[in-house]
Amino acid sequence: MLYLLNLLKDITGSYGLAIILLTVLVKLILWPLIHKGNKSMRRMQRLQPKLKELKEKYKDNQQEFSRQMMDLYRREKVSPFGGCFPMLLQLPVFIALYSTLDSSVELRHVSFLWAQDLSRPDLIGPTFMGIGLHPLILISTGLMVLQQKLSPPMADPSQQKIMMLMPVIMLVFFYSFPSGLALYWCVNNILSILQMKYSQYAAKKEELALNNTKPA
């Protein structure tokens, strides 16, 4: 990972810009899977009426409802976890970047924007009881909330609750992480929102074209 960051730094002239470029490259590589996952989420949204019918029909039998729901997914060729797969594929990059920021002396005391050290949290202002203000993590959390607002609702209530808790979990878990890692996650969330908006635009355009080709 350090070799790749050094290569990107030679291109951009900055480790901060190198991390941003790395995020863009990862997103471009994963774009086919992300686009497929977004399509799966839209298909899930179209299944909502059928899922509501099943939920009402089997409201007293949760086990049978779960079985019928999975059968519906299978018939419609929809994966309830399709949107999560690209995020899981990014974990190795995330872990490798964290390890590099934590252990590489080249990245210590390297500043970018307001962050004085990419290998340390981007602390701004005084601390209170040992807790300071880390803008990049707060921005990333806000972007995650926005992304959830723009995403189609999940059919499974338990999955929906987990996704609603994810920004809070990420905020607590990553609050003291290196600012270089927070920068990666922040840019990643921005690109995810842009990709989602593009997928929604492409889907509407495709649906409009399909409607125009239907015989009157």
Regions inferred by a protein language model and the residue ranges of each:
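Helix-loop-helix
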Residues: 1-216
